[in-house]
């Protein structure tokens, strides 16, 4: 059997075997050569910080092994027997190999091994195995000895989670340069690596760096940037560019050192913040402990004070009572005598009227249930007394007094019987006392000794219980005790010898008899049910009515309770009864068909989708835990609503422009018709002049000629207006801008910037109001309940609807004023777009909608549809007017596609546009002057260059990306353009200003968002040309 190992077997036991030097020294360590003790750190002696502990742990040498004992590892010599046995370990293979495995030994029953005599040892098998079931025996033909060590069994002490290591990762094979796919080659060229990029992350392991987070992603980006930088360095063999390479490397290293310093500073700031929080928490805990201690002390002192007050009050009351009692006998001496019954009844403060309790009971009161009710029997009149006396027998009214007789002398048997009766009476009195005080019985059910009535000459051997009749003076043996006749009880009182002897022998016979005693269980007598006296016959109907009313009230109360419970659980009841009302096929409820969502019309589905998306957006924003992100999302929600309103206003303006153009064309046609009618009238007058008189014909001819001249002039004016309206783009293109050194594209870009500056100025005011309303809404939603939140949401929707109606009305009024301008100026409101012809050929784009299933709202969702609508609104995109309100949705989709293409072109030419940014201010001023000189054609120029406006808008956003210098330069140019735009707008006509006012209100919020759909820093700088990234 395996013996327990001792601490120093590795040093002293020559047979102790280990696998190697590591296990040898590990056994010495496990022997307990060192003890751990706690040592103070005096520099941090009073510190409570976790990273500056006041004490530490150190090893204390407690080794008791002498110094001359060798601690080195001395491996045992290699034994050929062990080598042979290990070599033959794999001799058994195939399906029979598991039969020779040894299982781990379990501590079950004891194992008794009996050594067999040498002559009966079995022969050595030809193949041996270290894992064989039976160890190999010594001896044999080869003369091999027993190996030095044996493997009894192996079983791990560790669980799976403790033995778990890093997850296994498969190996990889680097492909040959010629075997790379096009994608792999493109990725390697893109990230400047000779091997797959994932191999650059070999140092990331699961405990450290994996799964990847924000820091790992930042690290990967830095590695990519560094490889790109190294690839962009001049070659090292270029001697002429070595200084440039050195300077670039130094700048890069300086940048890395600066980033590292910033990272270290941020880490230190975080540590300081954690320390500050820990100190604050500690101070709060100390304050709480001090407060609790003070409160406990206060409560203890208040309790002590209250106890002292109670003691003083009790002492005061006792002293006052003694003084009052002593004051009674100042003049009159106190008589110390027991009050008589008359005095006790005369004094209403005596114990007769107010008895004192002892042990919770009134000793002089009658026991419970033994009171005598005399209310219904005591006479109250003289006639009642007479009737009572006539009813009572005379022996109760006339007491009979007899002289006491001299007791007769008793003989021996009578005295013995009397002694037995006294003993029985004493036992009976004890039992009655126990019954009345200790509660050992109830009624007649109280314990009593059993008597054994068996025996010769004493009856049939049945058991009886001694009973007593209190107050009657009789005591019988009960049952058939002693086989006595029914008159045995009276004979006992008369002192008969047989009865006395039987009574005397009763207890003895009970003790001597060999029959076992049994327990007699009596039925428990319940107290009688109390009954109320019958009401008089006169009040019987009233009593019955009161009882009926009480029953009705109780029934109604029970019904109200049942009704309240049913109402409170009505939803659950309806849910449980849903199976009863639903038809078998699941298509009807109570006979009515179930209206499925897929059966609704397109308009209802669209409205439900919009309402659901809006509610989901608000719920997602309110569920956001970060206050800053919640404010950003709310601002983005307001911007998206403003974008939608701007798109609707643009569509309404397009409808108004279309109607104005239709009215102008109708007026021109009417004028042409009038001119034709006048010509016909002139011809008729000429014919009449030939047939009629000369004078009348001359007058008619003159009138007809005048009418024809007036109609011709009106038609000529109408035709000139139509021609001017059609030629407005040509006149705008024919402006002599080249003489000023300004190309048409630059003029359009300057016009867009002026308009954006004007609208950005109004957008700042609108956004300020939106932020104020959003802050108030957030406060209400953060502090209110669900009903208030729902009310606020309904108020927001109503406010947005009313605002949209006001903007539409203002835009309609402005366009109506602008449509009336041709009477003063022949220029129409806007030229007809050429895009209307190819509208049917465009493929409709899917309308993007905010996701209502996501938990968090992303502002990037507004990048495509809201940002494009706002860009078209700011640039005066005439394509929004195509098709009117009926085709506005398709046109918005086409504008979104055109805007995406323009944005891609703007990003491709960002570098070329950056060089032209310096002259933007001069170009804007020149454009303003040109627009002021040709105010009649300025609006047409802006409308004709709608695509250029959108491109300039996106180019302005692209130019804001390169760096802080470009942003500052763009901001300065935007401010100058805003001032010039304000001056130019001030010089324009009243009709144009009104139209721009309505358009600016419609697109006010659009100036606050950049191409990314997010809010810009500041108060609406995005509307001035600086797009938010």
Curated annotation (Swiss-Prot):
SMART domains: IQ
Coiled coil region boundaries: 272-299
Compositional bias annotation for Gly residues: 1000-1015
Amino acid composition bias (Basic and acidic residues), ranges on this chain: 984-999
One Gene Ontology biological process: cilium movement
Source domain of life: Eukaryota
Biased composition (Low complexity): 837-854, 911-921, 933-944
Record flagged with keyword Coiled coil: yes
Annotated Acidic residues bias: 890-910, 922-932, 964-982, 1016-1029
Disordered: annotated segments: 72-97, 117-170, 837-861, 876-1029
Cellular component aspect of the GO annotation: axoneme; motile cilium
Places the protein is found: Cytoplasm, Cytoskeleton, Flagellum axoneme
Any one Pfam family match given in the protein's UniProt record, by short name: IQ
Oligomeric form and interacting partners: Identified in a spoke-associated complex containing CFAP61, CFAP91 and CFAP251; the complex is associated with the radial spokes of the axoneme. The complex associates with Calmodulin; the association is calcium sensitive. Interacts with RSP3.
Protein role: As component of a spoke-associated complex, regulates flagellar dynein activity by mediating regulatory signals between the radial spokes and dynein arms.
Descriptive protein name: Cilia- and flagella-associated protein 91
Classification of source organism: Eukaryota, Viridiplantae, Chlorophyta, core chlorophytes, Chlorophyceae
């Amino acid at each position: 059997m395996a013996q327990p190992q001792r601490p120093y077997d590795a040093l002293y036991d020559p047979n102790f075997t280990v696998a190697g030097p590591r296990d040898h020294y590990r056994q010495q360590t496990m022997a307990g050569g060192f003890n751990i003790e706690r040592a103070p750190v005096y520099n941090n002696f009073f510190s409570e910080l976790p990273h500056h502990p006041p004490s530490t742990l150190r090893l204390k040498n407690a080794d008791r092994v002498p110094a001359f004992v060798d601690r080195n590892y001395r491996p045992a010599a290699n034994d050929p027997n062990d080598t042979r046995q290990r070599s033959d370990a794999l001799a058994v293979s195939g399906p029979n190999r598991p039969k020779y495995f040894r299982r781990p030994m379990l501590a079950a029953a004891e194992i008794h091994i009996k050594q067999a005599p040498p002559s009966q040892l079995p022969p050595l098998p030809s193949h041996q195995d270290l894992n064989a079931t039976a160890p190999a025996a010594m001896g044999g033909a080869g003369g091999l000895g027993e190996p030095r060590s044996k493997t009894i069994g192996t079983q791990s002490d560790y669980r799976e989670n403790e033995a778990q290591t890093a997850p296994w990762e498969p190996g990889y094979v680097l492909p040959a340069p010629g075997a790379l796919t096009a994608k792999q080659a493109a990725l390697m060229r893109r990230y400047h690596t000779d091997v797959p990029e994932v191999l650059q992350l070999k140092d990331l392991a699961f405990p450290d760096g994996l799964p990847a987070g924000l820091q790992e992603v930042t690290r990967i980006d830095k590695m990519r940037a560094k490889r790109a930088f190294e690839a962009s360095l001049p070659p090292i063999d270029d001697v002429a560019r070595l200084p440039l390479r050195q300077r670039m490397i130094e700048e890069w290293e300086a940048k890395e050192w600066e980033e590292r310093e910033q990272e270290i500073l941020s880490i230190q700031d975080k540590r300081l913040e954690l320390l500050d929080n820990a100190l604050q928490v500690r101070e709060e805990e100390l304050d709480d402990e001090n407060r609790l201690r003070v409160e406990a002390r206060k409560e203890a002192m208040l309790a002590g004070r209250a106890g002292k007050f109670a003691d003083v009050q009790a002492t005061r009351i006792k002293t006052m009572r003694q003084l009052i009692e002593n004051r009674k006998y100042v003049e009159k001496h106190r008589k110390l005598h027991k009050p008589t019954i008359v005095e006790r009844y005369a004094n209403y403060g005596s114990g007769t009227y107010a008895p004192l309790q002892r042990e919770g009971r009134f000793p002089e009161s009658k026991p419970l249930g033994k009171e005598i009710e005399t209310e219904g029997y005591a006479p109250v009149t003289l006639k009642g007394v007479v009737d009572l006396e006539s009813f009572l027998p005379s022996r109760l009214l006339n007491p009979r007094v007899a002289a006491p007789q001299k007791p007769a002398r008793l003989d021996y048997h009578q005295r013995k019987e009397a002694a037995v009766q006294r003993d029985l009476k004493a036992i009976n009195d004890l039992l009655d006392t126990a019954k009345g005080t200790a509660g050992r019985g109830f009624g007649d059910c109280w314990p009593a000794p059993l008597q054994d009535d068996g025996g010769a000459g004493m009856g049939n051997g049945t058991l009886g219980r001694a009973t007593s009749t209190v107050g009657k003076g009789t005591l019988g043996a009960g049952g058939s005790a002693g086989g006595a006749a029914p008159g045995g009880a009276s004979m006992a009182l008369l002192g008969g010898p047989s009865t006395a002897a039987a009574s005397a022998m009763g207890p003895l016979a009970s003790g001597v008899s060999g029959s076992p005693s049994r327990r007699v269980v009596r039925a428990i007598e319940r107290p009688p049910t109390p009954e109320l006296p019958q009401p008089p016959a006169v009040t019987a109907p009233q009593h019955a009515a009161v009882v009926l009313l009480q029953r009705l009230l109780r029934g109604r109360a029970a019904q109200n309770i049942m009704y309240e419970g049913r109402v409170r659980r009505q939803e659950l009841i309806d849910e449980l009864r849903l199976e009863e009302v639903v038809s078998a096929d699941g298509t009807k409820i109570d006979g009515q068909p179930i209206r499925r969502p897929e059966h609704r019309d397109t308009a209802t589905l669209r409205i439900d989708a919009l309402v659901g998306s809006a509610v989901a957006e608000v719920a997602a924003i309110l569920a956001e835990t970060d206050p800053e992100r919640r404010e950003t999302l709310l601002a983005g929600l307001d911007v998206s609503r403003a974008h939608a309103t701007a798109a609707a206003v643009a569509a309404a303006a397009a409808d108004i422009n279309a109607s104005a153009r239709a009215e102008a064309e109708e007026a021109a046609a009417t004028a042409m018709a009038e001119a034709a009618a006048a010509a016909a009238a002139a011809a008729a007058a000429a014919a009449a002049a030939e047939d009629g008189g000369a004078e009348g014909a001359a007058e008619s001819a003159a009138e007809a000629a005048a009418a024809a001249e007036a109609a011709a002039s009106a038609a000529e004016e109408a035709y000139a207006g139509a021609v001017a309206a059609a030629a407005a783009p040509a006149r705008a293109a024919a402006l002599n801008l080249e003489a000023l050194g300004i190309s048409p594209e630059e003029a359009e870009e300057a016009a867009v910037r002026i308009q954006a500056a004007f609208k950005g100025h109004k957008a700042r005011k609108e956004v300020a109001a939106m932020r104020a309303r959003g802050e108030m809404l957030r406060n209400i939603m953060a502090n209110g309940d669900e009903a208030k939140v729902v009310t606020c949401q309904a108020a927001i929707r109503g406010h947005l609807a009313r605002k949209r109606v006001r903007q539409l009305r203002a835009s309609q009024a402005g366009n109506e004023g602008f449509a009336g301008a041709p009477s003063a100026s022949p220029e129409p409101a806007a030229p007809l777009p050429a895009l209307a012809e190819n509208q049917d050929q465009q493929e409709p784009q899917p309308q993007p909608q905010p996701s209502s299933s996501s938990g968090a709202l992303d502002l990037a969702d507004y990048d495509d549809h809201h940002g494009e609508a706002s860009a078209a609104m700011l640039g005066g995109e005439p394509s929004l007017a195509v098709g009117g309100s009926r085709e506005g949705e398709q046109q918005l989709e086409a504008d979104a596609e055109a805007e995406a293409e323009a944005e891609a072109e703007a990003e491709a030419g960002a570098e070329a546009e950056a060089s032209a940014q310096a002259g933007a201010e001069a170009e804007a001023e020149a454009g303003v002057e040109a627009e002021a000189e040709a105010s009649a054609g300025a609006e047409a120029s802006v409308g004709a260059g709608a695509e250029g406006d959108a491109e300039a808008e996106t180019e302005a956003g692209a130019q804001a990306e390169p760096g802080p210098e470009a942003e500052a330069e763009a901001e300065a140019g935007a401010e100058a353009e805003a001032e010039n735009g304000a001056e130019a707008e001030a010089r324009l006509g009243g009709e144009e200003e009104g139209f721009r006012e309505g358009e600016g209100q419609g697109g006010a919020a659009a100036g606050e968002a950049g191409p990314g759909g997010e809010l810009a820093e500041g108060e609406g700088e995005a509307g001035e040309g600086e797009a938010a990234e």
